[in-house]
């Protein structure tokens, strides 16, 4: 079963807006890329800004529900013309959502635990933080990589078979590639690319979700070859889809 086009479209629009809200909450919490790298800094941050951070990750968890409905609906739209790439969009997206869901849920539950532990046993809290932070980083990387690959597959299908506007397809490819770069170049000599691609990948993902959501809402299908009119041949099957 798949969601109705308008439900999937609305979910995509809200997922884009939700990602912007989540990003704004993270930014206004005072968090930076280096905050979680040092246990003392991280625990002090959780003590002072834990409530703000928990609001941000709650928004993220809600947003992932919307992304799930949107991804299933988008894959269903693409399946009629590009079944293989639609399957990639769906399954890669589900893996990415599952991985990424561990980040907001882990922080939502972990923040009060670490704050309490830091008060009672600072040494134990500091010792436990390193492993916890590494797990959070890994879960986020799984989410970013597989959601990026899902978006790239969707963009490729749109470009090839005109299931939605071609410019949206190119945006999807660019979004997915940027997201993959943020993961694959991290902790390498090319780490500067990961840092530089992070904000653009986030912005592109917001635009892609909103635009694709609008397309699903409107039911904009643009067949590559118009069928049913005299003088027009049926298109040959696309064996590479």
PLM features per residue range, with description:
Residues 1-241:
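Hydrophobic, aromatic-enriched alpha-helical segments typical of multi-pass transmembrane helices
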